[in-house]
């Protein structure tokens, strides 16, 4: 489920200790076949035990862009495995604790290592430390793959300052963003008889701009409309997934899914902006 970090800020990571993880694309979503380079990122501790899962994007054959709180080694992340199947965890069986088709979350299925699945023991966190310095949380991360993955297309980094000016220019509130990830699709109250639902498949949804310069964004975060009224939003497990500038066919990543303000995945969503020169420099340095 989402981890409550303060009274109101909630990270969109899916913890391994829960039978049903907590963050996925919600609301008006569709299956995402447009972005084959978006993967399900599974993290393990020093003992090789599954601790949580996120989403991420290949921006080169070996470099996966995700959130800093996902690749936070200070919180126990040591290694990772990334699955690029659209239905990476669709056949997950709680009784056995794995998906017999993909091997999620324990292994790469035979014949998929280096094609649809890869391992990593090289994780980087831009500086995320439990939201210290908010709103500049430094919530960007990288997973460097042991096996290069060939894709017909990769995620594209933005020009520095790509979002600058959108908050003040006329007509920009209708700017479209597309989110993609493997998180929860429905999140209910913990006391509800209706369970949270996680398909563990790659979904995407579109939304529009809310704010870039509020006290919660201040030039570091991107706030978009959440679930409802023909919109889609993010939830637990979507952390680190791409926020694309434009309609679903866009490959330009301007932010990574970072946090929300509601434990039921309602309300607005926040992504950590990567169109800032210092963030781009850090990404390109690895």
What are these regions (language model features)?
Residues 25-33, 48, 77-166, 215:
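Conserved catalytic-core segment of clan PA serine endopeptidases
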Residues 40-45, 226-227:
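Short beta-strand segments that buttress and anchor functional surface loops
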Residues 42-44, 181-185, 259:
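Generic short beta-strand segments
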Residues 31-39, 52-103, 107, 198-214, ...:
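C-terminal subregion of chymotrypsin/trypsin-like serine protease catalytic domains
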């Amino acid at each position: 489920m989402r981890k409550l970090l303060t009274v109101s800020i909630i990270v969109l990571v899916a913890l391994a200790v829960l039978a049903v993880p907590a963050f996925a694309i919600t609301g008006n979503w569709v299956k995402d076949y447009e972005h084959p380079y978006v993967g399900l990122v599974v993290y393990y501790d020093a003992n090789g035990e599954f601790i949580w899962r996120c989403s991420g994007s290949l921006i080169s054959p070996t470099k996966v862009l995700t959130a800093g709180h996902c690749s936070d080694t200070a919180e126990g992340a040591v290694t990772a495995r990334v699955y690029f199947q659209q239905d990476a965890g669709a056949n997950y069986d709680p009784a056995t604790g794995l998906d017999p088709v993909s091997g999620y979350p324990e292994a790469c299925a035979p014949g998929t290592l280096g094609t649809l699945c890869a391992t990593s023991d090289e994780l980087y966190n831009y500086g995320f430390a439990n939201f210290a310095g908010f709103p500049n949380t430094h919530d960007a991360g990288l997973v460097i793959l042991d096996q290069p993955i060939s894709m017909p297309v990769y995620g594209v980094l933005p020009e520095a300052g790509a979002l600058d000016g959108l908050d003040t220019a006329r007509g920009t509130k209708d700017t479209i963003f597309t989110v993609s990830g493997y998180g929860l699709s429905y999140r209910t109250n913990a006391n509800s008889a209706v369970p949270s639902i996680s398909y563990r498949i790659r979904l995407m949804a579109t939304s529009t701009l809310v704010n870039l310069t509020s006290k919660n964004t201040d030039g570091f975060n991107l706030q978009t409309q959440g679930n409802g009224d023909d919109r889609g939003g993010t939830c637990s497990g979507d952390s680190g997934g791409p926020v694309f500038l434009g309609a679903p066919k866009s490959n330009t990543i301007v932010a990574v899914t970072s946090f929300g303000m509601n434990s039921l995945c309602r309300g607005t969503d926040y992504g950590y902006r990567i169109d800032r020169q210092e963030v781009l420099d850090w990404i390109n340095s690895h």
